[in-house]
């Protein structure tokens, strides 16, 4: 079996996931990991799956596109071996943390926060953010891979410092 990463997006409609899983079953694919969400009416999914070695990238892509044609899915198939050595090196000796941040919805906070994470070599492995309509605020939850060199209390202090101008509150906890 060979692992492939598949990324897809389409306007959300009932039945998309059923079509995707049917196509995978047709090709004898075995799901390893997936993440799926709907954002403002658009379905998006990324997953890792093993397929028989005899199936090439084009065969997998073409079959998924054919089965999912009624949904007008945009899709890409990637070989993780091209990128995994770099990724694996980047997450060695890291600890999983969950960061919750909220505050006034003003432009610039995510940029400042992501620049801080990049400077400290912290990988953001997951993120969900939403604007709350009732009072012009935002809520965000991030999954972080902290290098062993980062002290969580110091990171929280830096987040609170850069977020002060945006009226943010932050909570950082080890991921369970």
PLM features per residue range, with description:
Residues 1-176:
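A conserved regulatory-domain signal marking ACT and ACT-like small-molecule sensing domains
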């Amino acid at each position: 079996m060979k692992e492939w990463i598949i990324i897809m997006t389409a306007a959300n409609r009932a039945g998309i996931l059923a079509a995707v899983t049917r196509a995978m079953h047709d090709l004898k694919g075995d799901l390893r990991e997936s993440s799926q969400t709907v954002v403002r009416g658009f379905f998006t999914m990324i997953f890792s799956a093993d397929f028989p070695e005899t199936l090439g990238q084009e065969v997998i892509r073409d079959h998924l596109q054919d089965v999912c044609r009624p949904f007008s899915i945009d899709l890409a198939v990637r070989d993780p071996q091209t990128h995994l050595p770099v990724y694996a090196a980047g997450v060695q000796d890291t600890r999983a943390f969950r960061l919750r941040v909220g505050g006034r919805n003003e432009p610039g906070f995510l940029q400042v926060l992501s620049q801080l994470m990049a400077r400290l070599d912290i990988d953001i492995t997951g993120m969900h953010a939403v604007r709350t309509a009732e009072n012009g605020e935002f809520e965000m939850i991030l999954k972080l891979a902290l290098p062993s060199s980062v002290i969580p209390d110091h990171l929280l202090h830096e987040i609170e410092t850069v977020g002060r101008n945006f009226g943010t509150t932050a909570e950082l906890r080890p991921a369970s």
